Amino acid sequence: MAMTLKEKSANTHVKTEWPAALKAEFAREAERPNGCVGSELLSETGKLRVWTIRLKPGERIGFHRHVLNYFWTSVNGGRGRQHLMDGTTVEYSYYPGETRHETYGAGEFKVHDLENLGDDDMIFITVESIEGSANKPLPIPDTVRLKAA
């Protein structure tokens, strides 16, 4: 069953004082929006972008911006921490196969990061809908695109 962030309760959801380095990274993202919503872009067509995120224990993917309708699926579950654009910090437990869908109207977006708090790798697949989204996709660098073996 798909859930939105609002439907799933966080294990913790608090307003915290972020470290200076995190604040600086967030400010840089605001100046230059980061459309890399995953670690690696596996596939891209005129309709979809398919990403993977693989985080080792303690590893973090930096602040990035969601502007397109999308869904993600947790491949193997785990525990993660996100710093959200409203200044809150949330922690979630994810279960294998958990899937969430999010949509954005014209001009709407979400900025957040994700850190693996668990003892095992945390893996997600994210699929962005280019076609049917109210916003245009953000540019992404070639360095995140899957390289053929």
Q: What residue spans do the PLM features occupy?
A:
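A short, N-terminal "cap"/entry segment at the start of jelly-roll beta-barrel domains
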Residues: A2-T52, Q82-L84, T89-V111, E115, ...
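Short, surface-exposed binding/anchoring microloops in extracellular/periplasmic proteins
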Residues: E44-T45, I53-R65
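His-enriched metal-coordination microenvironments in redox/metal-binding proteins
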Residues: G62-V67, H112, N116
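Glycine- and acidic-residue-biased ligand/ion/polar-headgroup-sensing regions
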Residues: H66-D86
